[in-house]
């Protein structure tokens, strides 16, 4: 793909976007067939209450656990959706016992193991 800029001008624009916060970070999409295999576990969390106090405490606790890779406040049947990556069921059991079940205000935890990744890291479509 051509952008009509010299490499140095392109790098300068990237640096400016990083400094302005337009580019917040970078992600490596690792092919699980080329690395140690991990399993994505999607976890739906229902809180006892959905008050600002409960939401704030839950979110603060989630941020303290690097095992939790993603966390979304949701509409629908669950309050939050989390993602963790584990090597096996035993590793997930540890996270369930030591992390998920200790999060404040949790009423229900529902976990689903992915079978395989169908689509990840898609860039925003051009319009």
From Swiss-Prot:
Domain of life according to the entry: Bacteria
Name the chain's protein: Uncharacterized HTH-type transcriptional regulator y4sM
The processes (GO biological process) annotated in the record are: response to amino acid
Please state every residue range assigned to the domain named HTH asnC-type.
1-46
List the Pfam families hit by this protein, alphabetically.
Answer: AsnC_trans_reg, HTH_24
Task: State the organism of origin.
Answer: Sinorhizobium fredii (strain NBRC 101917 / NGR234)
Keywords, A to Z, come to:
DNA-binding, Plasmid, Transcription, Transcription regulation
PANTHER family in the cross-refs: LEUCINE-RESPONSIVE REGULATORY PROTEIN, TRANSCRIPTIONAL REGULATOR AZLB
